[in-house]
């Protein structure tokens, strides 16, 4: 029912409790670790002392005395993000977030990557943080394609500069493949 931190590495010990709580929709992994540190989480009626504790399927887990249902299977959602929303759970500036606008009844989800506040388009959401990280890593070779509207005229030299990589405000960005779909006036 509970694997201690020094259990086997073969997957039979279950899943770390903070990750399990996050997949169950209780809280983010970081918030779950905080709950554990505060002594609010119990596994098989014993206070969990460390987030390195492992949970087996079917184990009895409670938070603040309330039973937590088993973690959900991994799910992936498509969301059309309109402009004017920020891709974060909490914005210190008080701007509206993607997560505040999701329909009720969804599990707790995280975004796969992000779109800027003024951007709109497809945003993938998942209840599995590890999947989100795998999909975000450039080393995994996922091709990302963006369509943008540019105000002003784009010259061939601008596209060539993007193909070589650019530095913006001291940050170096790698090369990207860019082309024009269409030209409409000054857009």
Language model feature labels by segment:
Residues 2-187:
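Basic, flexible Lys/Arg- and Gly-enriched helix-loop patches that mediate nucleic-acid binding at interfaces
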